[in-house]
Every structure is written in structure tokens, then in C-alpha cells.
Design a protein with these regions (language model features):
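C-terminal motif of bacterial Sec signal peptides marking the signal peptidase cleavage site
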Residues: 41-42
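Well-ordered alpha-helical segments within folded domains of soluble proteins
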Residues: 526-537, 546-547, 579-591
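Extracellular/oxidizing-compartment recognition motifs
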Residues: 47-129, 133-520, 527-528, 544-549, ...
Length: 591
């Protein structure tokens, strides 16, 4: 198992990145804005006189960088009466050294006004935070004007530093409940820094001492699992304490173990298997010593209350099976069994250094329409990609079905006709875009962890009469959390609405890769993406998403050069839409 890309992939990645970074060049579409009498605004703070927007690998302050030559980039201010003729980069493991002109690690001086450079100093160490800043000199002044200090933190830079084993449970691909895993350990010394890296075949949610690590959803991003799996590194220093500590992991199927059936045959993927993961905790103590804690068969596992999950359809949850405190110290894990060590499912693990999927907004229903004593339809203010959060108390064993859709029929009931026609269910146990929740009799809360949907309306039906209101169900919008970088407005209300609708549609189709729709397919259609990219990059900093996706192209390309029309894919798409209209994405996206 490799922890770095091979040289061929590195060459492709560097080419792709350079092209994506140069996307700022103006195209003919820019002139169309002028012809329409509109204005395109940049969000750049022109009043700044110091360098700004410092990034490493296209991300501000990333954690988990796994290359020895990270790309550093920044923006320089526009000086009205002077010009920049030299840029200096200073880097150190000690932020206090950067307060002056000292650097205990690396510095570089470049003539001109460059806005990016690749680190070329001495080898970086794994699990180490590096601080850096940018300064510039002008033609008229020798004084250097510095930026604020930024940083990046490395992850695992060598397989020699990886101590975790791949582990799974005793079940096969047909088993439906999602597993819990836990590991209890003792800390007897004071910690300076604790970094936890996890890579999973399937989706994961990570917690430490009962607290969720990070604010990401649907990690790791979708890849061709046989060839590449992404790892995620979290700084968990603040979550640990002296004495007993517990790491908790819940695994979901994602695209790895696709138990739903549709026309693209993801259930027949060559990689398909029961979800598994590998993880390690790197501890640096205040006395200067370090320690690794990795996954192995000593970890314990059992079933979670998630009794079914599909990235494509929905999630089913039995609140009666909840295990309060399962990922916290003091929990009695009697009855749990040991995890099984297993083989690595992939050739390569790469760090997921990109804008993650996050919750970006919440919406209360504009209407909660009661159909009868056991059926309600929620109307939300906009069509979104995401999930719903249910908070309800009802009779123990009552089954709620939350049917998400974009249309209503003439009776005001959710109509799935526009989104479920590629679905090929083998029975009625996995209804499309329909979460199923079995109530515990107490106050229950449910929000899917391993699924997302496209919807504006939700039909909630109950197996027994129940009283619901608009407070019981909230719509949660999520997507790859790419920063907005452009703003557009005009004197035309219609054009302004079109711009807002375009952005909403673009974001609803950005989940670690560009998709065609967040409900019917969730596929990375190459043709759809190259049509949308120019508009997308004018409005959002999505370069890290497209760079990851271009690496997916490298994984999917056949030896004869053929690419599928959906990327990633399991088997479908190599003999359909292979002309320039679709395959040209391999050139248009980097451009």
C-alpha cells in the first residue's frame, strides 16, 4: 500500500493543477457580461497593503498535507503608485521565529511578483505544523511588507510511519446494519499535539470522547477504491484528556458497498466489500516524546442503530437500538466483539486536502400541511441538496417514513416521477429518497450520516397517528464548502434571479466531485461538468474539487486512452458517450 502517488500520476497532477490555477484568464464570456450591461465584482479586498489569502495546496491552513513539495500560494495587493519587484517566503516550525526575519527551516527570495511557489527545502516531517509568511519589496522602498502568519500541518509522509491495520467486522456485503468501532486507551502525560488520520473504504464518522471530530460530512470523498482512497486528518488535541480516552468510528456503505440497485451497476463494482478502515493517532507530548496508536484487532465492534444506509437512496434508523455513551469513557462494552484485521483494499492512500462537505444552511418549513392523522407534507423555501433533521417523540415502535422529493401531485403528496426512474429496486425495503425511523418512545433525534438527497418537499407518514408541526423537521443544506469569490449583479431582476439559481444548482451538485443531479443519479458526468466549470470558477473557489476529480480521471482512464462518461465509475460508461462532447472534459476542465 502506497502513501504517495507514483511519478506518472504526479506529473499528471502537476499539469492539471497548473492549468486549473491559471483559470483566472478572462474568456469571451466575460465580454458577454459587459454586453448585457452587468457588472462582475471580485471579492478581493483591494484596500489591503499586505499579502493576503495565503494557501497551501489551494486550502487555507490545511491539516494532513502529504507531499514533500507543497504548493504555497498568495495574493499581492494592487499598489497605485509603486510596483512589487521581489517576494520573500519564510517558513519555520516555530511561529515566534517568523515575528522577525528569522527562519529555522526555509526561506526563499524571488525576483518579480510571483503568486505561488512549491516548497523545495529540506524534507518535511510527518505530523508537524509549519508556519509561513510572505513579504514583498517595491521598486521605491527596500522595506519588506509581510503578510500575517499562516500554517499547514503535515499528515503521514511515509508508509514507514503508518502503524494502523485495516480492520472490519465479521459480516459480508449483504449485511445491512452499519457498525460501530471503539478503542479505549490511557493518557498519562500532557499532550502538546494530537493528530488522528483515518482512511476508510466506505464512509466514516469519527468521534473522540463522545465529541465529533471536525464538521465534515460524507468523508472520505468518492474515488475508484481499488486504486485510491483518501485519508482525512483531524487535530484532536482539544478532545483528549488525562486518564481514559475513547476513539469511536461509525462506518457507512457510501459507494463502496452499494446495496441499492440502479441502471449503473454500482452494486456490481469490482471493489465492493463490507466497509473497512485504517486509522492512527499521533501523539506529541510536552516532554518532546511521540507515540502512535493504530487500529488493530484489539478494537471492539458491534451494530449501530443505523439499520440500513445507501448513499443513493436513504438511511434507516432504529432509535430503540441506541447505545448511549458508546464512544465515551466508562462505557460498558460487554457483548462487543473484536474487529478483524484485513487486507488493504487499495493501491494508494492520499490525503484529502480539499474543501470538505459541510452543512451550510438550515431551513424551517414554510408550511406543514396535515393530510390526515398520520401523514404530513413539509414545504421548504427552496430546492436543496442535503438531508432533514427530525426531532420527535412518539409511541415506541412507531415507524415514520420521510419521503423527499421535488414535486407534488394534485393531491399535495410528494411525487417521485421525475427522480426515481433509473432506480431498479429488488423489493420494497429500500424506497427511493425515503428515510425510515423507528421511534424509541423517548425524545428522538435523527439526521442521516451516510446519505444526501435533492428535495424541496418531505412527506412524513406514520404507522400510527402522530401530531407533527413545522418544528419537528428542519431541512439541512450541504455541499462541498467552497468559498464564494465572485459577485454578480445587474439592473435586471430576472438576470439576478438566474444568477442566484445558477449558483444554487451548481452547489447542489458539488459533493467532492461535480454531479449532474443530487437525487436521480449523483453521477459525475464529464460533459455536464465541463459546461458548468467556467461559471463555477468565476463564482466559487472550487479548484481543490476539480483537482481531486482530475485524479479520478487518471484512475479511470484505460491503457488505450478511453475514458468513461461518468467519473468515478464501477463498470458503466466506457462504451457510451466517448466522443469529444464528453471526453473533452479531460482537456477543458484543466484549461
Amino acid at each position: 500500500m502506497k502513501y504517495q502517488q507514483n511519478s506518472k500520476r504526479e506529473e499528471k497532477s502537476k499539469f492539471i493543477t497548473n492549468q486549473l490555477t491559471n483559470m483566472a484568464h478572462i474568456s469571451i464570456r466575460s465580454y458577454l457580461y459587459l454586453l448585457l450591461g452587468t457588472t462582475l465584482f471580485s471579492c478581493a479586498p483591494q484596500e489591503l497593503k499586505t499579502p493576503f489569502e495565503l494557501k497551501c495546496e489551494n486550502i487555507p491552513v490545511p491539516v494532513g498535507v502529504d507531499t514533500q513539495t507543497p504548493r504555497l500560494s498568495w495574493k499581492l495587493p494592487l499598489l497605485e503608485e509603486d510596483s512589487i519587484n521581489r517576494v520573500e517566503i519564510w517558513l519555520s516550525t516555530d511561529s515566534t521565529q517568523l515575528s522577525g526575519r528569522q527562519s529555522g527551516y526555509w526561506n526563499k527570495s524571488i525576483i518579480g511578483a510571483p503568486i505561488r511557489v512549491s516548497y523545495d527545502g529540506q524534507p518535511l516531517d510527518s505530523y508537524t505544523t509549519y508556519y509561513w509568511k510572505i513579504g514583498y519589496q517595491t521598486s521605491s522602498k527596500q522595506k519588506t511588507t509581510f503578510s500575517p502568519i499562516s500554517s499547514f500541518t503535515t499528515g503521514c509522509l511515509s508508509s514507514d510511519n503508518w502503524k494502523g491495520k485495516w480492520i472490519t467486522d465479521k459480516h459480508d456485503i449483504t449485511y445491512r446494519p452499519a457498525p460501530y468501532y471503539r478503542k479505549s486507551f490511557q493518557l498519562d502525560k500532557t499532550i502538546e499535539q494530537a493528530l488522528l488520520t483515518i482512511a476508510s473504504a466506505g464512509l466514516h464518522e469519527l468521534s473522540v470522547n463522545g465529541q465529533r471530530a471536525g464538521n465534515h460530512f460524507l468523508d472520505p470523498m468518492y474515488t475508484h477504491f481499488n486504486k485510491r482512497i483518501l485519508s482525512v486528518t483531524h487535530d484532536v488535541t482539544s478532545l483528549l484528556s488525562m486518564g481514559e480516552n475513547v476513539i469511536g468510528v461509525q462506518l457507512g456503505n457510501g459507494w463502496y458497498n452499494h446495496q441499492s440497485t440502479a441502471v449503473w451497476f454500482f452494486d456490481k463494482a469490482s471493489w465492493r466489500n463490507r466497509p473497512k478502515f485504517t486509522a492512527q493517532l499521533h501523539l506529541r507530548y510536552t516532554d518532546g516524546t511521540t507515540e502512535y496508536l493504530g487500529t488493530d484487532s484489539a478494537w471492539q465492534t458491534t451494530d449501530s442503530p443505523v439499520i440500513f444506509n445507501s448513499i443513493y437512496t436513504a438511511e434507516h434508523y432504529d432509535a430503540q437500538k441506541e447505545l448511549a455513551g458508546w464512544d465515551s469513557p466508562g462505557f460498558n462494552a460487554t457483548g462487543w466483539y473484536h474487529a478483524q484485521e484485513t487486507e488493504s483494499p487499495t493501491e494508494t492512500i492520499k490525503s484529502q486536502v480539499m474543501h470538505p462537505i459541510r452543512e451550510t444552511a438550515r431551513y424551517t418549513a414554510t408550511q406543514c400541511k396535515k393530510i390526515n392523522d398520520s401523514c404530513y407534507v413539509y414545504h421548504f423555501p427552496k430546492n436543496i441538496a442535503g438531508v432533514t433533521e427530525l426531532k420527535v417523540k412518539g409511541k415506541k415502535g412507531t415507524k415514520l417514513r420521510l419521503k423527499h422529493g421535488e414535486l407534488l401531485d394534485k393531491n399535495g403528496i410528494v411525487n417521485m416521477a421525475n427522480i426515481d426512474y433509473h432506480y431498479r429496486p429488488t423489493d420494497d425495503s429500500d424506497p427511493f429518497q425515503t428515510d425510515i425511523v423507528i421511534l424509541s418512545g423517548k425524545q428522538d433525534r435523527f439526521m442521516p450520516k451516510f446519505n444526501y438527497k435533492g428535495f424541496q418537499f418531505v412527506e412524513v407518514s406514520s404507522s400510527a397517528p402522530i401530531q407533527l408541526s413545522d418544528e419537528n423537521l428542519i431541512a439541512v443544506e450541504m455541499h462541498s464548502d467552497v468559498p464564494a469569490i465572485g459577485y454578480w449583479s445587474s439592473s435586471s431582476d430576472l438576470l439576478n434571479k438566474i444568477w442566484k439559481a445558477t449558483n444554487s444548482s451548481y452547489l447542489a451538485n458539488l459533493f467532492g466531485y461535480p454531479t449532474d443531479c443530487p437525487q436521480r443519479e449523483k453521477n459525475g458526468w464529464t460533459g455536464d461538468a465541463h459546461i458548468a466549470i467556467e461559471t463555477g470558477l468565476y463564482n466559487f473557489d472550487g479548484i481543490s474539487i476539480y483537482e481531486k476529480w482530475m485524479n479520478d480521471f487518471c484512475d479511470e482512464q484505460k491503457d488505450n486512452g478511453i475514458l468513461p462518461c461518468i467519473i468515478p465509475t464501477s463498470v458503466w460508461g466506457y462504451d457510451w458517450a466517448n466522443g469529444v462532447d464528453w471526453t473533452s472534459a479531460v482537456a477543458i476542465i484543466p484549461w
